[in-house]
Amino acid sequence: MQTQEQSQKKKQKAVFGIYMDKDLKTRLKVYCAKNNLQLTQAIEEAIKEYLQKRNG
């Protein structure tokens, strides 16, 4: 059973601003719209996969 503090730590988010190619951003937005995803969800999943493949 998780404590309230552990649960809150899991939900903490940080702002992460980046510069991205406009075409790539458009493709990502279209993909998210078609797949009912938020941009944050898609980006987090992509980064997790990227790091997992590289033992990061």
Swiss-Prot record:
GO biological process, one term: regulation of DNA-templated transcription
One Pfam family from the record: 56B_RHH
InterPro entries: 56B_RHH (IPR049123), Arc_rbn_hlx_hlx (IPR013321), Ribbon_hlx_hlx (IPR010985)
Name assigned to this protein: Uncharacterized protein 56B
